[in-house]
Each structure stands twice: as C-alpha cells, then as structure tokens.
Amino acid sequence: MTPERVPSVVFKTRVRDESVPGPNPYRWEDKTTEQIFGGKKVVLFSLPGAFTPTCSSNHLPRYEQLFEEFQALGVDDIICLSVNDAFVMFQWGKQIGADKVKLLPDGNGEFTRKMGMLVEKSNLGFGMRSWRYSMFVNDGKIEKMFIEPEFGDNCPVDPFECSDADTMLAYLKGAEAPGVSEPVKAFVG
C-alpha cells in the first residue's frame, strides 16, 4: 500500500564547505524529510543502484535532460534516490554530469523501507535495494506514484516501463505517456 505522505526520516548527506581544510572540503549534514519536501513540489525517482546500466544510461540522464520542462510546470526539485551512501552518489553524479537533479543517498534504506519499496536483490549481489519507482510530491503529500511492475525480492528482471522522466512529465502535463525514451547516454561498465 502506498503511503499518503513521504515518511519522516533523516538523510545523511555530504555538502561542500570551504571552511573544511584539506583536499576534501566536505562535511556531513543531516537533512530531514521536512527540509527536502516541505512547501515544495518535488519529483522523486528511485532506482536500484548508482553506476548500473539503466540508471546510468537513461533513468537519471533523462530527468536531467528534461529538468527545465519540469521546472516550467512548477516543479521545484527533482531528486534521484538510491540505497547507496553519500560518497557513491557523489561520484556517480560527477561521472554522469548531473548538476540539476539532486542525488539523495538513502544509505541505510530507511526511507525506502518506510515507503514499502525495499527489496532483496541478492540474486545480483546487491543486497537490499530500492525498487524502481517515481512519485510527485506536493508539500510532503504523495500525489502520484509510478511503480514498476513485477515488484518483489530477487526479481529476475529490472522493469523500466513507467518510472521514467517522460511518463512523469506527461502526467504533470495531463497528457498520454509516450513510453520510455531511448537511452540518453551510453553505459560504460
């Protein structure tokens, strides 16, 4: 069952801070669900893992590519969430060139678990990960969710049919979804 509101959790993030000495000027910063979603219109999409093929070739790059179109429809932030730590998410964002979509690490999987989207992916050596989904959130209230089919532990496939950027954009425009776009970037890995 989909919750009505985003769950209340604290995310462990890393932020740049020039007052931190040395070659790695970052510090830990806790961010609450209220800080992230409160008073904002947010599109959040969640995926199984940074650096994975579909996530790197289409899911994140297409949201990045369509960012201005989402903004024109009143979306304040687009957030990519994964059950990965802050260091992995940061390096993946650099490698992809993501500078518009915010990458949010759910390192302990708490948000994902409370959303009911945590699945076992030990068949791929991933452990506990997020199922692929997207949602439109208005001031913490979940207005629409697109959850990929075949939800379950150790699913032998990785569906990518409805959590894509084009489907969410079509929903916000009140239009028919055109289907998943072709990959935006080539996956190297």
Swiss-Prot record:
What remark does the entry add? The active site is a conserved redox-active cysteine residue, the peroxidatic cysteine (C(P)), which makes the nucleophilic attack on the peroxide substrate. The peroxide oxidizes the C(P)-SH to cysteine sulfenic acid (C(P)-SOH), which then reacts with another cysteine residue, the resolving cysteine (C(R)), to form a disulfide bridge. The disulfide is subsequently reduced by an appropriate electron donor to complete the catalytic cycle. In this 1-Cys peroxiredoxin, no C(R) is present and C(P) instead forms a disulfide with a cysteine from another protein or with a small thiol molecule.
Instruction: Extract the CDD domains matched here.
Output: PRX5_like (cd03013)
Q: Which InterPro entries does the record associate with it?
A: PRX5-like (IPR037944), Redoxin (IPR013740), Thioredoxin-like_sf (IPR036249), Thioredoxin_domain (IPR013766)
From its record, what is one biological process in GO terms? cellular response to oxidative stress
Catalytic activity, reaction form: a hydroperoxide + 2 glutathione = an alcohol + glutathione disulfide + H2O
Described purpose of this protein according to its UniProt entry: Thiol-specific peroxidase that catalyzes the reduction of hydrogen peroxide and organic hydroperoxides to water and alcohols, respectively. Plays a role in cell protection against oxidative stress by detoxifying peroxides.
Question: What family is this protein classified in?
Answer: Belongs to the peroxiredoxin family. Prx5 subfamily.
Q: Which organism is it from?
A: Synechocystis sp. (strain ATCC 27184 / PCC 6803 / Kazusa)
Active site as annotated: 55 (cysteine sulfenic acid (-soh) intermediate (for peroxiredoxin activity))
**Pfam name, any one:** Redoxin
User: What's in the keyword line of the UniProt record?
Assistant: Antioxidant, Oxidoreductase, Peroxidase, Redox-active center
Task: Give the range the annotation lists for the signal sequence.
Answer: none
This chain's protein is named Peroxiredoxin sll1621
Q: Which EC number(s) does UniProt give?
A: 1.11.1.27
According to the record, the segments passing through the membrane are none
Keyword Magnesium carried by entry:
no
**One GO CC term of this entry?**
cytoplasm
Class in the EC hierarchy, top level? oxidoreductase
Disulphide connectivity of cysteines = none
Q: Determine if DNA-binding is one of this entry's keywords.
A: no
Thioredoxin domain segment(s): 2-177
Record text on subunit structure and interactions: Monomer.
Q: What GO molecular function annotations does the UniProt record carry, in alphabetical order?
A: identical protein binding; thioredoxin peroxidase activity
Report which superkingdom the organism of origin falls in: Bacteria
